[in-house]
Design a protein with these regions (language model features):
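The conserved cystathionine-beta-synthase
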Residues: 15-32, 38-39, 89-107, 114, ...
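Tandem CBS (Bateman) regulatory domains
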Residues: 1-11, 51-88, 95, 100-104, ...
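Acidic (E/D-rich), amphipathic helical modules within compact regulatory domains
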Residues: 19-65
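Short hydrophobic beta-strand motif reused across regulatory alpha/beta modules
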Residues: 34, 47-50, 114, 122-129
Length: 152
């Protein structure tokens, strides 16, 4: 049986809850990610910031505020004020099917993977898409082998 550990990303980018919205914005843009786990000083998982959360906390483009002023505003907002703390989580041993069901119902697009209170990985919808592609490749290869065997 596949578990969350088999598919999760362990090479994580995370910020601390006292980092700023500006740091989160820059990190998400540079790393091209949509989900940013947030940890405390001890490395314990405390929340999640999504791209949608970032947009909700951002200054509207309709406001006539220059870029530097916007960045100054973002630099004064700690992540603990805008992050989601009521986030569904998974353990590394959670069956992958259950993790998929949680992703579908929670609609966050990711599941932080926590063990002993510490963030150890993240499971995203993209991970499941990659798995689906691998399974389709394996199925197609199997079908080609069956066809070749039938022709002999």
């Amino acid at each position: 049986m596949l578990t969350t550990r088999d598919l999760m990303t362990e090479d994580l980018i995370a910020l601390r809850h006292d980092d700023t919205l500006l740091a989160a914005k820059q990190t998400m843009e540079e790393a091209r990610i949509r989900h940013l786990p947030i940890v405390d000083e001890a490395g314990a998982f405390v929340g999640l910031l999504t791209h949608r959360d970032l947009l909700a906390a951002s200054v509207s483009g309709l406001a006539e505020i220059d870029t530097q002023t916007q960045e100054d505003i973002y630099a004064g907002i700690p992540l603990r004020e805008v992050m989601r703390s009521d986030v569904a989580m998974a353990t590394p041993d959670l069956p992958l099917r259950q993790a998929a069901e949680v992703l579908l119902t929670q609609k966050y697009g990711c599941l932080p993977v926590v063990e002993g209170g510490k963030l150890v990985g993240i499971l995203t919808a993209s991970d499941f898409i990659r798995l689906s592609l691998e399974l389709m490749d394996a199925l197609e290869a199997s079908e080609r082998l069956e066809c070749a065997a039938e022709e002999e």
